[in-house]
Amino acid sequence: TGDNNILDAGEVINFNSTTPGIYTLEDFGNNVSTLIADPTDATNTVVSVIKGNETWAGTTITSGTVIYPLTATNTVMTVRVWSPEAGITVRLKLEESADATHTVETDAVTTKAQEWETLTFDFSNEATNDGNPTNPLNTDYVFDKLSIFFNFGSVGSSETYYFDDVTFVGAATTDPVTGSELVVNGDFQAGS
């Protein structure tokens, strides 16, 4: 987080530092999280998560020490994840550590099995619980607590997931339009 405790756009939370710092792990719902060598790159340290038996089992990465500065236009974070299966819902939740009612949650779904991928989480698209929306993004809140939930909404059976490189991207990006051509015919009319 640079010289302050604000995770600015482009900054990354990773787990390679051997110096005790502001990033701590706290499990709930019978999750078990540990720092381990990346199973695909032993020079990198990642978080291993064994999914607990509760549908809401998760891991908090810091509480009350890092500020995640969401705004109306800066709503996107990414996390690099490894999942045993594709199609797994991963939820990120931000909240104020001093007021558990001040939250925002969003989901992403894995597309790869047994390999790393980067998932994008846009907090302007709040998650749902049993078809009901969770709290919408309120940029007046000071989010300083981040939790991750693997296979959210499903009972765990000790599956192992990994994550690393929590990044505050900031603004959502729009993919370029592909599959169409612009033909210039000299007078700005549609060409053929």
Predicted regions and their residues:
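Beta-rich carbohydrate-recognition modules and glycan-binding surfaces
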Residues: 1-192
